[in-house]
A protein has these predicted regions:
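Positively charged n-region of N-terminal signal peptides that target proteins for export
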Residues: 1-5, 23
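Sec-dependent N-terminal signal peptides
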Residues: 6-14
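OB-fold nucleic-acid-binding modules
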Residues: 22-87, 91-313
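C-terminal motif of bacterial Sec signal peptides marking the signal peptidase cleavage site
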Residues: 16-20
């Protein structure tokens, strides 16, 4: 009984303090909403994401360019890691281009889809990893040894120094280009890499493309406590499994890849054959793939993975 009375007494004392000793801690000030003026007033220059990508066009694979000028980019958030398929990254788009920001947090909690983010680029590295440019920290020697072109902004201090939250908003048509069977040959270019794209009229196909067979998943194991993983392409049907977007069984989660096409008869058309690559951690990993030949639309981040094009849902 004394224990209960002690707890009640503490609660009463706390209640008294909060009612009689009001302070600013009770109602924290609203978070600052950053605007263009906050950066240009300090001599910063806001450039488009396309301009940033153009100035880094000569950066080779696994290489990076350090930004030494007081440049700032801004764009709306077009990705979310809530579904588990985008990991430690945020993609932003300003209507001219899109790019990945390499962060280290559960991003959907902090950055809302449609919200404007500002990025102070000075001191950051624009890296080229597997044909995709991204914004991150200067890579360490260990990163470079692993062919990483930059690194995640690991600490809150780093993120606070470079990432600034602007106003909430909505995505508009300029943030969501549309590709169709009629326009993909001319409209779908590398300028769409890193952008959220709606692909309409795609056909799901079980079959071959560019030397690979789909659908498949990438088994990733560390044999005999090795530090380097061994990767093996496996096929759902060969393993007696229903084809799904990814593999998630017995606490093992592997990437899955499936083929969607605008031209099912041409296995050499890289623009017309898109690989959808899904993490085994995605909350839709075990959703069944469509029936072979089914047609529909996919909204995805358009990326390259090595020399292949593909869409990350």
């Amino acid at each position: 009984m004394k224990y209960k009375l002690l707890i009640y007494g503490i609660m009463a004392a706390m209640a008294f303090c909060t009612t009689s000793c009001y302070s600013d801690f009770d109602e924290p000030a609203p978070a600052k909403v950053w605007t263009d003026a906050d950066f240009t007033a300090d001599g910063g220059e806001i450039i488009t994401i396309k301009a940033l990508k153009d100035m880094c066009a000569g950066v080779g694979l696994a290489q990076y360019k350090e930004i030494t000028d007081n440049y700032i980019i801004k764009g709306k958030v077009i990705s979310s890691d809530q579904a588990g398929n985008v990991y430690k990254s945020v993609y932003i788009d300003d209507g001219t281009a899109g790019i990945e920001l390499k962060l280290m947090v559960s991003n959907y909690v902090y950055y809302q889809v449609g919200q404007t983010l500002y990025v102070k680029l000075k001191g950051l590295a624009i890296g080229n990893y597997r044909y995709m440019l991204s914004v991150g920290g200067i890579p360490s020697e260990k990163d470079i040894a692993k062919n990483y072109a930059n690194r995640n902004l690991d600490t809150q201090v780093e993120r606070d120094a470079h990432i600034f939250m602007g106003e909430l908003g909505q995505l508009t048509e300029e943030n969501l280009p549309v590709i169709t069977r009629e326009n993909y040959k001319t409209a779908l270019t590398d300028e769409y890499l890193g952008r959220l794209v709606r692909f309409e009229g795609l056909t799901y196909k079980e079959g071959n493309f560019d030397g690979d067979r789909y659908p498949q998943y990438l088994e990733t194991v560390y044999l005999n406590n090795a530090t380097e993983a061994t990767y093996t392409n496996k096929y759902f049907k060969d393993e007696g499994l229903t084809p799904t977007y990814a593999y998630n069984y017995q606490n093992q989660r592997y990437y899955g890849s499936s083929l969607f096409t605008y031209d099912a008869t041409d296995e050499t058309d890289k623009k017309g054959n898109l690989i959808v690559r899904v993490s085994g951690y995605a909350n839709f990993a075990l959703d069944a793939l469509p029936q072979n030949g089914a047609t529909g639309a996919i909204t995805a981040i358009y990326t390259k993975y090595s020399s292949k094009s593909g869409g990350y849902i």
